[in-house]
From Swiss-Prot:
This is Type II secretion system protein M. The gene is outM. It comes from Pectobacterium carotovorum subsp. carotovorum (Erwinia carotovora subsp. carotovora). GO terms for biological process: protein secretion by the type II secretion system. Type II secretion system is composed of four main components: the outer membrane complex, the inner membrane complex, the cytoplasmic secretion ATPase and the periplasm-spanning pseudopilus. Forms homodimers. Interacts with OutL/GspL. Interacts with OutE/GspE and OutF/GspF. It is a single-pass membrane protein. Pfam families: T2SSM. GO terms for cellular component: plasma membrane; type II protein secretion system complex. Its main location: membrane.
C-alpha cells in the first residue's frame, strides 16, 4: 500500500487528474455493462413476451367464437348413454388428442391432455357439448413456445348435464 501511495505522490498533478478521469470512466463502464445493459435486455424480453402472449389471447378469443354454445346443441343422442370417461377416451382419439390423466368425479371429469392442436381441441369440445351434453366447467391452457397453434391443456373440467 505504501508503494502505491509513493507512486501516486511521485506523479505530477496532471497525471493524477488523468488517472482520476480514467478511473471514473472505468467505473461508468462497469456500471453500464454490469447493471444497465442487462436490465434493458430483460425489459425488451419482457415486452416481447407480453406482446406474444397478447397475440395468443387475441387469437384464442377469435377462435372461441367458433365454438358452438350448449343451447345450440341439436346433435344425435347416440352416445348420451355412454359414461363420461369412456366418451372422453373415445372422442379424443378421433380428434388426435392424447389423454394424459382422466379422473372421474361423479357427473364430472378432470382431464389433462398432452400437447394439442388448439383448433382440434375446440372442435372436440364443441362436439362434446353439441352431441353429448357435456359442458366445460373450467379450462387451463398454455401456449407451447415455438409451436404456433399448439397448446398444453393442464386442466380441463367437464360435466355431463344430462347424465343417463
Amino acid at each position: 500500500m505504501n508503494e502505491l501511495r509513493q507512486r501516486w505522490q511521485a506523479m505530477s498533478q496532471r497525471e493524477r487528474q488523468l488517472m482520476v478521469v480514467c478511473a471514473a470512466v472505468l467505473l461508468l463502464c462497469v456500471v453500464y455493462y454490469a447493471i444497465l445493459q442487462p436490465w434493458q435486455e430483460r425489459e425488451d424480453l419482457w415486452e416481447r413476451t407480453i406482446s406474444r402472449e397478447q397475440q395468443t389471447v387475441n387469437w384464442m378469443q377469435k377462435q372461441a367464437s367458433s365454438i358452438p354454445r350448449g343451447n345450440q346443441a341439436q346433435g344425435d343422442n347416440s352416445q348420451r348413454d355412454v359414461s363420461l370417461p369412456i366418451l372422453i377416451s373415445q372422442s379424443t382419439k378421433r380428434y388426435g388428442l392424447t389423454v394424459v390423466r382422466l379422473q372421474p368425479q361423479g357427473s364430472q371429469a378432470s382431464v389433462t391432455l398432452g400437447q394439442s392442436d388448439f383448433n382440434s381441441l375446440l372442435r372436440w369440445l364443441g362436439e362434446l357439448e353439441q352431441k353429448n351434453g357435456v359442458k366445460v366447467i373450467s379450462l387451463d391452457v398454455n401456449a407451447v413456445e415455438q409451436s404456433p397453434g399448439i397448446v398444453d391443456v393442464t386442466r380441463l373440467m367437464l360435466e355431463r348435464t344430462d347424465e343417463a
